[in-house]
Amino acid sequence: MQDEKVFIDRLLHPKTQHEAFRELLQLYQKPLYNHIRNIVLNHDDTDDVLQNTFIKVFQNIKNFKGKSKLFSWMYRIATNEALSFLQQKAKKQGISNVEAQQKALNKLESDVFFDGDEIQLKLQKAIATLPEKQQLVFKMKYFEELKYEEISEIVDTSVGALKASYHLAVKKIEEYLKVN
């Protein structure tokens, strides 16, 4: 944790903040991209949300209190940015979040950046049937292999509730895959 404190100090100091922020980008760009991509599904939208995430991190690093890990704090920002983006996109299109997600899934098949096979696509369709929170928990646990404690810090939910949510999500996905 001491190393993180030193790193945050470098992010805050005018003489070292640009170099430190470059390091932050190198360290977290790929995992945050994957996290956001799991939520918004579209490559171009993911790039936009990722850029907004790093802008918010840079603008708000001075407000980071150190109550959680920097990683968790940034993931929370990325999660909120991605969910807000989806809500705004659905609102602009005059459709519900569920309908917007279905449209995104339909586009996923033709997305040149989607490297999954038919099984992966079926899994994404199964995940899309889950409530938003269960989707988020499932994706963070299954795809990103985050620990429950890390997810707890990111989504501000107890570990017990996360375990229950993940278990329910797995059951629903299994059921969907059996039927389809």
Question: Which sequence ranges carry the predicted segments?
Answer:
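N-terminal module of bacterial RNA polymerase sigma factors
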Residues: 1-30, 38, 179
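Internal acidic/polar
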Residues: 1-6, 92-116
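Sigma70-family region 2
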Residues: 13, 54-69, 89
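Amphipathic, Lys/Arg- and hydrophobic-enriched alpha-helical face
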Residues: 25-43, 60, 127, 176-179
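Hydrophobic-face residues of short alpha-helical interaction/recognition segments
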Residues: 32, 36, 61, 74, ...
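Structural recognition of an alpha-helix C-terminal capping motif at a helix-to-coil junction
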Residues: 48-55, 68-80
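Arg/Lys-rich amphipathic alpha helix in sigma70-family domain 2
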Residues: 63-65, 79-96, 168
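A short pre-motif secondary-structure segment
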Residues: 137-141
